[in-house]
Amino acid sequence: MTMTATSIDVRVQSPKIDVRDLNFYYGKFHALKNISLQIPEKQVTAFIGPSGCGKSTLLRTFNKMYALYPEQRAEGEINMDGENLLTSRMDIALLRAKVGMVFQKPTPFPMSIYDNIAFGVKLFERLSRSEMDDRVEWALTKAALWGEVKDKLHQSGYGLSGGQQQRLCIARGIAIRPEVLLLDEPCSALDPISTGKIEELIAELKDDYTVVIVTHNMQQAARCSDYTAYMYLGELIEFGETEKIFIKPRRKETEDYITGRFG
């Protein structure tokens, strides 16, 4: 399958993140190639594409997860609120507070449900006990988990089901009140019922947050997102409103992937 590079010129009304000519390298391997797109504010944007296409790599550039590894580097611009995150001197912990992340596998901390939520908050704010109690309840309620755990807040997060653990991780992420929430295949390890709850939660979260989700599940992208980006071999092939991408894609490569003729 031969593809040629294309210019993606889709302007969104209120971009929260503006990516321009982004290139990313794992050592000498060129993983992302001249990516340019705008992530709309308080909308859900989905990244789709086959394994190894670069969608998770792109997601992780938004909060500089690659900074943990010296051999990895990004070039270009990722602008948020008028500041290029790639050259910004913003404290990395502060950046990750503004741009939260939930990973593919639920990763609760080895502590109580309450402390899972309170831990990150304590890094950035000094709250009284009653204020912290309110924040914990608020975050767990936002993550549609409060009703299930309110009577066992001091039990280990490890005692929750997989779907509950993932919602706990989402609650932990929003407890520090980020502006952007990154979800890297958050439902891939979950059963259909838990997946449905996460999808309902995503729909509610966009009222307050800019949400970006990586998913292998095209039906999930169609259900959950407002905008969709299709990637292949480190290139952005097509980006636009989800309904248009799935009903009338502009690129044959996108149509082939969505219809299952390629993938």
Curated annotation (Swiss-Prot):
Keywords: ATP-binding, Cell inner membrane, Cell membrane, Membrane, Nucleotide-binding, Phosphate transport, Translocase, Transport. Residues 17-258 form the ABC transporter domain. Its EC number is 7.3.2.1. GO terms for cellular component: plasma membrane. It is a peripheral membrane protein. It is found in: Cell inner membrane. The keyword Ribonucleoprotein does not apply. One of its GO terms (biological process) is phosphate ion transmembrane transport. ATP binds at residues 49-56. Pfam families: ABC_tran. It catalyses: phosphate(out) + ATP + H2O = ADP + 2 phosphate(in) + H(+). Belongs to the ABC transporter superfamily. Phosphate importer (TC 3.A.1.7) family. Part of the ABC transporter complex PstSACB involved in phosphate import. Responsible for energy coupling to the transport system. The complex is composed of two ATP-binding proteins (PstB), two transmembrane proteins (PstC and PstA) and a solute-binding protein (PstS). This is Phosphate import ATP-binding protein PstB. It comes from Ralstonia nicotianae (strain ATCC BAA-1114 / GMI1000) (Ralstonia solanacearum).
